[in-house]
């Protein structure tokens, strides 16, 4: 049941990386506050499980598989949102990749590309597509999950820390340019959290 202060009844929310961990909890919280949540992650079975749990608890949710490191997946996701709902009120960019743990000098191109594709390019174009829908319907909110590593890089987490620092600055760029459109953009910087990365 939604509380008056954070009543999101009638709002359409998208959460990426929502099949477990922080994203799953954000999706459940938004649903408890009344939003209809599009539960998105790479694997449809995992998305479906979270969406079913939300529905069992009385909330509204729909699963939709999307790898935010894949531009075609992002295009398909937003085409679906436009067709099914016609608008988007909340976008939580939470999907992340951290495939490499080791010295920065030993980072290989594959790990570099995967981390950048998801954590920077994915967040950027998810925000662009969300922002276009929000701009056309009076505004909305974009929330990016960064990391405390954006401010203080963790040991042996070089490329991950670099991408999360980029997310913080990206959020500032979108906040400044999209504020006149009624779109708020903010970042979360969680510390170490027990979860699994792709």
Regions inferred by a protein language model and the residue ranges of each:
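The beta1-alpha1 cofactor-binding region of Rossmann-like NAD(H)/NADP(H)-dependent oxidoreductases
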Residues: 44, 65-77, 109
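Substrate-binding pocket helix/loop in short-chain dehydrogenase/reductase
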Residues: 102-104, 108-113, 142
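Active-site loop-to-helix junction immediately N-terminal to the catalytic Tyr of the SDR YXXXK motif
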Residues: 107, 153-161, 173
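Active-site helix of classical SDR
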Residues: 127, 163, 171
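Alpha-helical segment proximal to the catalytic Tyr-Lys
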Residues: 132, 176-180
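Residue(s) in the substrate-gating loop at a strand-loop-helix junction
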Residues: 147
């Amino acid at each position: 049941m939604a509380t008056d202060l954070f009543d999101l009844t009638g709002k359409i929310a998208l959460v990426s990386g929502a099949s477990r961990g922080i994203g799953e909890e954000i999706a459940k919280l938004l649903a408890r506050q009344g939003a209809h949540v599009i539960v998105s992650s790479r694997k449809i079975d995992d998305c479906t499980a979270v969406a079913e749990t939300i529905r069992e608890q009385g909330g509204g949710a729909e699963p939709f598989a999307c790898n935010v490191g894949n531009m075609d997946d992002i295009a398909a996701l937003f085409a679906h949102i436009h067709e099914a709902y016609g608008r988007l009120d909340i976008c939580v960019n939470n999907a992340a990749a951290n495939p490499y743990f080791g010295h920065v000098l030993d980072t290989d191109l594959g790990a570099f590309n995967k981390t950048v594709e998801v954590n920077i390019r994915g967040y950027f174009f998810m925000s662009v597509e969300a922002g276009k829908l929000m701009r056309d319907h009076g505004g909305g909110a974009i929330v990016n999950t960064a990391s405390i590593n954006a401010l203080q890089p963790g040991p042996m987490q070089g490329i991950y820390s670099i991408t999360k620092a980029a997310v913080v600055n990206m959020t500032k760029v979108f906040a400044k340019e999209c504020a006149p459109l009624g779109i708020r953009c903010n970042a979360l910087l969680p510390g170490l959290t027990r979860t699994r990365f792709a």
